[in-house]
Curated annotation (Swiss-Prot):
Organism: Rattus norvegicus (Rat)
Region spans: Disordered: 114-146, 206-232
Description of post-translational modifications: Phosphorylated by AURKA.
GO biological-process terms attached to the record: cell division; regulation of mitotic nuclear division; regulation of mitotic spindle organization; regulation of protein localization
Family to which the UniProt record says this protein belongs: Belongs to the BORA family.
Chain's gene name: Bora
Biological role stated in the UniProt entry: Required for the activation of AURKA at the onset of mitosis.
Top-level taxonomic group: Eukaryota
InterPro entries, per the entry: Aurora_borealis_protein
Modified residues (Omega-N-methylarginine): 316
Swiss-Prot/TrEMBL keywords: Cell cycle, Cell division, Methylation, Mitosis, Phosphoprotein
Protein name in UniProt: Protein aurora borealis
Molecular function GO labels: protein kinase binding
Record's GO cellular component terms: cytoplasm; meiotic spindle; nucleus
Positions of modified residues (Phosphoserine): 183, 191, 250, 305, 311
Length: 534
C-alpha cells in the first residue's frame, strides 16, 4: 500500500493548471503520464514505412539513370505489331461481346421505360402501388392493383434511313412561314408593339403582317382571362394573329396608362380660358384692421383680383379691351351709416354732373386705338366729402409710424419741399393729361394681352399700405401702395382754398424688357411720410 501511495504522489503534477503537450506513442515506456489530459500530436496518425531487411531491388527510374539504353523506334513498332497479331483471337472476342450483351439485356441496372426486358419482376408490395377498398367494412376489403403510369425521359439516339421523308410526317405540325420570319414586322407579337400600333378605336393597323399559328387549348386560355393585360387579345376568341381578330373593337381597347386622354374638339385655343387670381391683401385686410364698412370696398374686391387672362386669339390683329373701371370713395370706419349713404349718393350725383367722367366710364369693354396703350378714367370728389378728405390728410402724420413698421422704402427719398409733388423717371412718352380726379388706371400689356385694374388692389385699405405683385407671364411688376399711392401710377395730394381733396393721376408708360419690367417713382411731401414703388 505504501508503494501505491508513493506512486500517486510521484505522478501528481506540480502545476495542475498547465496542460502538457505530449505524444504518448512516442515514449511507450513512460506510463506515468497516461492518466493526464494530453493533446494529440500532428505525428500521431502519420504512417512511416521502414525498409525491410529483405531482398534489395532498384526502381525503374533508378535503373534508367544508372544504365541508360538507346531504343530504336523501328524496334518498338515491330514489337507492337507482333503483340497485336498474337493477341487477336476471334473466338475469344466473340465470347466477350456476347457476355457484354447478355449482361446489359438480362441483368438490368437502369431499365429504360420504353423497352421491355426480361429482368426481375417487381414485387407485389411495391411502395408505388396502393390498395383501394371496395367496401366500408374491413372484411369487404379486396386488394386491387391500379393501373401504373410511367412518366420518364431518356436521351435517345434517333437513326433515320437515308430516304426517310421527315417532312411528310412532321410537316403538318411544324410549318414555318418564311415571309413572317424574314420581315421586320415579326416583332409585332410583343405587347409593346401591339399597344403602339393600336389606334383610338382599338383596331390594329392593316400594315402589320399576320401570322396564324395554332391557338393554345381552352385550359390555357381560361387561366389568363382574369389577369390584367395590355394585350388586345381577350375573351375565348383569342388568336395570336394580329391581323385577324375576331373580338369586337370595344373589347380590344388597350388600357390607357397616360392620364392625358385624347379629347377631340377641346383645344386650348378653341375656348377662352378664364382664371381667377385671389389676392391675399384683399382677403386679409378687413380682419387685420377691423374695417367692416361696406362703403369703402370696391364691388370688384371680394377676395379676388380683377386681373383676367384674355385669349390670344381674341386679341390677335384686333383692338384691345379694358377691364371695369372702379369707383372707390375715401371714407373712414368712424362714419355712421347715414353718412355712408350720403357719401354714396353724392358720388353718384357728382358722376352725373361731370362731363368728362361720364364718357370715360362708358369705356368698359370698348375697343381702344392701337396707339393708346393706356386709358385713364376719372371721377371727381365734391365738396361734400371735404371733411372726409381733411381727416384723411390729418391721418398722414399718424400713418407714418405704422408705415415704418409695415413697409420698406425701395428707393432713396428726396428732400421735402413746400408743396407735395411726385417726381418720376422719364421712361417713355404716352402720358394722358388728367387732373383733379381720383381715377383707376388700366394697363394693357401687349406682350401678354392682359388687362387689369390695379386700383382694386390698392384701394382696399385706405389707412394701411399694401403690396401687389402682378405676373403677366413674361414681365413681373411689383408695386407698393398706401393711402396716397395707387399701384403703377403717380399722384400728388394737396389742400386748396376750398378744402377739397384733389388727386391727379397720370399714366406711366412701362419700360417693357424681355426679362423684367422696372417702375420707379419718388414723392416730395410736406409731411415726413414718403412712399415709393418699385
Amino acid at each position: 500500500m505504501g508503494d501505491v501511495s508513493e506512486l500517486k504522489m510521484q505522478i501528481t503534477p506540480a502545476t495542475p493548471g498547465r496542460i502538457p503537450v505530449l505524444n504518448p506513442f512516442e515514449s511507450p515506456s513512460d506510463y506515468s503520464n497516461l492518466h493526464e489530459q494530453t493533446l494529440a500530436s500532428p505525428s500521431v496518425f502519420k504512417s512511416t514505412k521502414l525498409p525491410t531487411p529483405g531482398e534489395f531491388r532498384w526502381s525503374i527510374d533508378q535503373l534508367a539513370v544508372i544504365n541508360p539504353v538507346e531504343i530504336d523506334p523501328e524496334e518498338i513498332h515491330r514489337q507492337a505489331s507482333y503483340l497485336s497479331l498474337s493477341r487477336i483471337d476471334k473466338d475469344v472476342e466473340d465470347k466477350r461481346q456476347k457476355a457484354i450483351e447478355e449482361f446489359f439485356t438480362k441483368d438490368v441496372i437502369v431499365p429504360s421505360p420504353w423497352t421491355d426486358h426480361d429482368g426481375k419482376q417487381p414485387s407485389e408490395l411495391h411502395p408505388s402501388k396502393c390498395l383501394t377498398s371496395n367496401g366500408d367494412s374491413p372484411v369487404g376489403k379486396k386488394p386491387s392493383l391500379p393501373s401504373q403510369k410511367c412518366n420518364a425521359a431518356c436521351q435517345t439516339l434517333l437513326s433515320l434511313p437515308v430516304d426517310f421523308n421527315l417532312e411528310a410526317v412532321l410537316g403538318d405540325y411544324f410549318r414555318a412561314d418564311d415571309s413572317v420570319d424574314q420581315s421586320p414586322g415579326n416583332l409585332s407579337s410583343s405587347s409593346l408593339r401591339r399597344k403602339l400600333f393600336l389606334d383610338v378605336n382599338g383596331s390594329i393597323s392593316d400594315s402589320l403582317p399576320s401570322a396564324s399559328p395554332r391557338s393554345p387549348p381552352n385550359s390555357a386560355r381560361g387561366s389568363l382571362e382574369g389577369q390584367f393585360s395590355s394585350s388586345p387579345i381577350q375573351n375565348n376568341a383569342k388568336k395570336y394573329s394580329l391581323g385577324s381578330l375576331t373580338t369586337s373593337p370595344s373589347a380590344i381597347c388597350s388600357p390607357t396608362f397616360s392620364p392625358i386622354a385624347l379629347q377631340v374638339g377641346k383645344t386650348p385655343l378653341s375656348e377662352h380660358r378664364k382664371f381667377t387670381f385671389h389676392s391675399p391683401e384683399a382677403s386679409s385686410g378687413g380682419s387685420s384692421t377691423g374695417i367692416a364698412n361696406p362703403s369703402i370696398r370696391s364691388p370688384y374686391i371680394d377676395g379676388c383680383s380683377p386681373i383676367k387672362n384674355w385669349s390670344p386669339r381674341g386679341l390677335r390683329g384686333g383692338p384691345q379691351y379694358l377691364s371695369s373701371l372702379i369707383r372707390v370713395p375715401f371714407a373712414l370706419e368712424t362714419h355712421s351709416e347715414d353718412e355712408e349713404d350720403n357719401v354714396s349718393s353724392t358720388d353718384v350725383a357728382a358722376l352725373g354732373t361731370n362731363a368728362v367722367a361720364a364718357p370715360l366710364q362708358q369705356l368698359d369693354c370698348e375697343p381702344l386705338a392701337c396707339g393708346d396703350p393706356f386709358v385713364v378714367s376719372a371721377m371727381p370728389v365734391t365738396q361734400s366729402q371735404s371733411s372726409t378728405c381733411e381727416k384723411d390728410l390729418g391721418l398722414l402724420g399718424d400713418f407714418e409710424s405704422e408705415r415704418d413698421h409695415d413697409t420698406v422704402d425701395m428707393v432713396d427719398p428726396i428732400d421735402t419741399a413746400d408743396e407735395s409733388t411726385w417726381i418720376k423717371e422719364p421712361v417713355g412718352n404716352g402720358n394722358s393729361p388728367m387732373a383733379e380726379f381720383v381715377s383707376g388706371i388700366a394697363f394693357s400689356i401687349e406682350n401678354s394681352h392682359m388687362c387689369m385694374s390695379p386700383l382694386a388692389e390698392s384701394s382696399v385699405l385706405p389707412c394701411e399700405s399694401s403690396n401687389v405683385q402682378m405676373d403677366s407671364g413674361y414681365n413681373t411688376q411689383t408695386c407698393g401702395s398706401n393711402i396716397t399711392d395707387i399701384v403703377g401710377t403717380e399722384s400728388y395730394c394737396k389742400e386748396n382754398v376750398t378744402q377739397s381733396f384733389e388727386a391727379q393721376m397720370k399714366p406711366q408708360v412701362n419700360n417693357i424688357k424681355q426679362d423684367h419690367t422696372v417702375q420707379r417713382c419718388w414723392m416730395k411731401t410736406t409731411s415726413p411720410s414718403q412712399c415709393s414703388s418699385l
